[in-house]
């Protein structure tokens, strides 16, 4: 065999080893990036939001300790998702509230009352992780039974959350999170926060 053939094979074998080593490192780096990318380290840049509160339990279905635990959980998940995460509970009819907006939005059925309130609440407080009216989500859970016999909730999404969540995804989150809300409101709202974070970062 020609010495040149032997040298060539050694040359190829040498670089094949380094090529495979570099390829393996590149794959490991990509995996680490993917895992790290699931959580955000972005700082909140919205300076115009008029409140630091995220738990508005107007229906008084949570204890003070449960509210505080939710605030801690929400703060953690906000950093992970780079989204504001808000909870509002009510126990009142929204029929009169929604009627004010019918000239603008058209006739509203009772299941849409919560939509109007939730969207307005988000905008009025200028929620948004990156900017006012920016990235975030708000769950409005109204415990009141409207005239049609229904009890309604709404998931309001904005910015990146709106881009991420289709209507079917929002419905699925609400259905799963609020399945046992009557028996365990705190557990339901914890599930809302956790599910949103999972679905937002998966």
Locations of regions flagged by a protein language model:
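Alpha-helical transmembrane spans of integral membrane proteins, capturing the lipid-embedded, hydrophobic core
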Residues: 18, 22-26
